[in-house]
């Protein structure tokens, strides 16, 4: 099993015609991820590596049906509106790769996601991956590199640093220890999902036997995680 994403996960890319989004779209497709559509207002009718582009999230869903997730790669000033659009159209998993978003706007996105039963990963993250099944975001880089670093197995990964997420996976793989799911949670002060919020997912996953965590100084997330582990005797 896995957490959050698997071989059946479908997602869109908001801001798909931007340079970074074009790259991550190709990397995800090459890995085998199921990107059903992209969104860039005013660019409907184009395609990016065979992925059709639409003017809005609603149009993607109208054409392809319900979509599990969205990767948002738009300028900071447009990120909140993009996230709101995805959430209000029923998208439940949102990966925000954009950085330098005002904290107040991040807080507003996280609040709306909570109210609507959606989950945000990021901002300022590389996304997440279930090895051999699906990756959302630029995590791992090109497909060949991703397949070399990430292999299927019993270790979950949570990391503030996108680069260290892959470094940890590579080290584990070299030691013969594959990964269930790896999540780059984001390096900003305010993010959508903390270590403690991911723990119940890993705890409920029978495939995950241990978790590797990479943290960075500052914030309360580590203390919250310790409290969760103590309370739940994990």
Predicted regions mapped to residue ranges:
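Catalytic-core regions of core metabolic enzymes
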Residues: 1-234
């Amino acid at each position: 099993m896995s957490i959050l994403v698997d071989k059946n996960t479908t997602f869109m890319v908001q801001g798909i015609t931007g340079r970074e989004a074009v790259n991550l779209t190709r990397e995800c497709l090459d890995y085998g991820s199921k990107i059903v559509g992209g969104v860039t207002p005013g660019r409907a009718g184009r395609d990016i590596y065979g992925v059709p582009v639409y003017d809005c999230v609603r149009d993607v869903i109208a054409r392809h049906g319900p979509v599990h997730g969205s990767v948002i790669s738009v300028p900071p000033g447009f990120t909140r509106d993009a996230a709101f659009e995805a959430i209000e159209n029923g998208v439940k998993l949102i990966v925000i790769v954009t950085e330098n978003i005002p904290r107040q706007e991040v807080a507003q996105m996280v609040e709306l996601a909570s109210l609507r039963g959606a989950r945000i990963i990021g901002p300022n993250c590389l996304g997440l991956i279930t090895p051999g099944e699906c990756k959302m975001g630029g995590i791992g880089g090109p497909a060949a590199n991703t397949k070399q670093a990430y292999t299927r197995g019993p270790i979950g990964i949570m990391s503030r640093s996108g680069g260290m997420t892959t470094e940890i996976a590579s080290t584990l793989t070299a030691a013969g220890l594959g990964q269930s799911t790896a999540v780059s949670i984001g390096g900003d002060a305010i993010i959508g999902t903390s270590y403690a919020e991911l723990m119940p997912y890993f705890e409920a996953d029978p495939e995950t036997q241990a978790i590797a965590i990479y943290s960075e100084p500052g914030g309360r997330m580590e203390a919250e995680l310790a409290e969760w582990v103590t309370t739940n005797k994990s």
